[in-house]
């Protein structure tokens, strides 16, 4: 068993996703009068590598690297600005040398009229040159880097006065050291005092300067530019920038979302000056919307720096440049989503959609949670028979967008995941006042309610409040969407319990639940959730209570992670049906609404074939859209796309 588990861990860690091309035509496009809307990342997260001016282009094009789940590098041409924000054309795939692949840390820039990519592989700096004709990078030179105890990660390169300058991110050599969530069944990320048992690891900068001759030296020694306690968990991206006043420096991102700035010193014995910070117009350090902030500069048609583009998980944003403060810190304005032409409807990463008439105008909109921790409203500007979903609008509480963050201690995988909210909303009239409320679970495993205190057609959300079980704040496995609906005369609440099994609770009142027992299959067995029943492998299922087969009894539709094994590890789905990725399962209620009992799950099929959605999870929602008879299906995936499936094309 231990050998099989190790094999499964290795397979999951190298999984790069199964093709969803068979139903790419099912992806919902964003509706906009001018066809310009939020930029949709090609993966769960992405890294901006650099921006370059193509021939005759007014604004620089952008190179973007997708993640390990969807490894690729793309070039996006900037088509212009909309309200001061850049918008981009469709991506062009870029080829890389096979020995380099698509996942190395890199930096792309223009040097003497040509486009170069510089990549870190171990303790080597590899230069590649871009070939416009076949949209590829070709390796040209290689440099061995000495003087480092550990391999560098992020890199920035630029040329001045015939010399190449290089800055490297170098870690302090410590390992995070916390327990691995797949392996440790006890999984204690915090000690008895509440402190993380691993290390808060840091990085700093090394650098070197070489003559940019036709032939590089075989090796070069990198020397420290800073101490190694500059940034926690890493810079993620280092980018050279020239400001309109002539000042030059590098901007870095960070794991936690802050931005650092290092002015260029002008002295060859030390490339950069001491650390400064990137601040907002109130001189407060900017904390990016998402985890893994990765910045590159953006220039206008006369090559003046006018802003920065920042990628991360769940989105890509633009910050306008606003000058410097008295301390020499660069100032940037409020971030806005980067834009694209004819983009897919985009909800962030690991989205959890709900089809409901949120604004009370008679058609189905969507309320959607994501890994960032936001809950967004997607208005249907069309009709149910011809839906036209507009761009995301964040839902707010007393004027501030909902942004659930676990912080230092509320994420079961440790403080390095403090920025992942993984909010999973269920929209339902919970207190029977005729208004739709929002119930959530998230990365904290905390079940909360946002009561609607507005009026019909004008929803207003109150602050989140706990739900209680036997007087204690109700807690469950993380990242599940609770299934909430009326079963018979009572409101049912289904989620996964401490055994990672499906569990029924009944509503007592607006804030209190009572135990209804574990749910069972018709053979009397409990319904387990995951191959990994401990740590971060638990939970994650997205539960929907709905009469799917139209027999008058409400069933379960469940969006699973890839390694979901419902109802048990031995034969559970979808993992044991060929390991093809996350899926949507149908559990028919063979009992009654008052006493539900379920058949063995079946996998939802589109045009006769099971549908799959990558690694982390997928989330179903249903409604009468194209179909008057029966419920159509929308599935949100880990890349933030919404897939529409008409009922007539579905089977199980």
Residues of each region from the PLM?
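Bacterial Sec-dependent N-terminal signal peptides
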Residues: 1-22
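Beta-propeller-forming repeat regions
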Residues: 20-652
């Amino acid at each position: 068993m231990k050998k099989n588990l190790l094999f499964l861990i290795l397979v999951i860690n190298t999984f790069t996703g199964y093709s969803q091309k068979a139903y790419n035509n099912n992806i919902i496009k964003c509706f906009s009068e001018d066809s310009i809307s939020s930029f949709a990342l090609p993966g769960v997260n992405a890294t901006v590598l650099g921006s370059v001016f193509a021939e005759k282009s007014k604004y620089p094009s952008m190179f973007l690297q997708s993640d390990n789940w969807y490894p690729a590098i793309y070039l996006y041409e900037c088509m212009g600005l909309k309200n001061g924000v850049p918008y981009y054309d469709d991506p062009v795939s870029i080829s890389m040398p096979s020995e380099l692949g698509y996942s190395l840390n890199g930096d792309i820039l223009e040097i003497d009229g040509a486009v170069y990519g510089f990549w870190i592989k171990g303790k080597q700096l590899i230069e590649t040159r871009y070939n416009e004709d076949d949209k590829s990078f070709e390796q040209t030179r290689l440099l061995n880097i000495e003087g480092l105890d550990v391999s560098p990660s992020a890199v920035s390169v630029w040329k001045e006065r015939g010399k190449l300058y290089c800055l490297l991110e170098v870690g302090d050599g410590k390992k995070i050291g916390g327990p691995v969530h797949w392996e440790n069944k006890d999984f204690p990320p915090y000690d008895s005092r509440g402190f993380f048992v691993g290390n808060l690891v840091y990085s700093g900068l090394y650098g070197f300067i070489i003559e940019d001759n036709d032939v590089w030296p075989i090796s070069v020694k990198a020397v420290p530019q800073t101490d190694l306690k500059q940034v926690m968990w890493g810079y993620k991206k280092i980018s050279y920038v020239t400001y309109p006043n002539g000042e030059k420096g590098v901007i870095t991102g960070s794991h936690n979302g802050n931005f650092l700035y290092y002015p260029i010193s002008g002295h060859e014995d030390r490339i950069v000056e001491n650390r400064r910070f990137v601040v907002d117009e109130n001189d407060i350090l900017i904390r990016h919307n998402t985890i893994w902030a990765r910045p590159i500069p953006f220039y206008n048609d006369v090559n003046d720096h006018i802003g920065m583009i920042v990628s991360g998980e769940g989105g890509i944003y633009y910050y306008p440049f606003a000058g410097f403060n008295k301390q020499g810190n660069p100032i940037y304005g409020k971030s806005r989503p980067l834009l694209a032409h004819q983009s897919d409807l985009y909800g962030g990463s690991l989205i959890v959609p709900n089809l409901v008439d949120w604004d009370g105008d008679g058609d189905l909109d969507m309320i959607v949670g994501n890994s960032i921790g936001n809950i967004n409203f997607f208005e249907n500007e069309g009709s149910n028979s011809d839906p036209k979903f507009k761009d995301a609008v964040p839902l707010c509480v007393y004027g501030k967008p909902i942004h659930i963050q676990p912080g230092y201690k509320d994420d079961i995988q440790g403080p390095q995941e403090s920025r992942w909210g993984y909010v999973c909303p269920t929209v339902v009239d919970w207190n029977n006042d005729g208004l739709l409320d929002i119930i959530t679970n998230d990365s904290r495993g905390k079940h909360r309610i946002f009561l609607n205190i507005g009026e019909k057609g004008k929803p207003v959300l109150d602050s989140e409040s706990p739900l209680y079980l036997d007087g204690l704040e109700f807690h469950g496995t993380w990242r599940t969407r609770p299934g909430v609906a009326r079963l018979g005369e009572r409101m049912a609440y289904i989620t996964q319990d401490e055994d990672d099994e499906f569990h029924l609770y009944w509503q007592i009142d607006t804030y209190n639940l009572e135990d209804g027992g574990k749910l069972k299959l018709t053979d009397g067995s409990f319904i387990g959730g995951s191959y990994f029943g401990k740590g971060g492998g638990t939970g994650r299922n997205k539960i929907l209570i709905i009469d799917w087969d139209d027999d008058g009894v409400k069933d379960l539709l469940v969006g699973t992670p890839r390694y979901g094994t419902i109802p048990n590890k031995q034969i559970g789905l979808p993992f044991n049906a060929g390991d093809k990725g996350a899926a949507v399962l149908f559990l028919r209620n063979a009992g009654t609404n008052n006493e539900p009992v379920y058949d063995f799950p079946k996998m939802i099929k589109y045009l006769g074939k099971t549908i799959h959605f990558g690694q982390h999870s997928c989330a179903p929602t249903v409604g009468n859209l194209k179909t008057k008879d029966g419920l159509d299906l929308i599935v949100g995936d880990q890349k933030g796309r919404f897939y529409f499936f008409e009922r007539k094309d579905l089977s199980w």
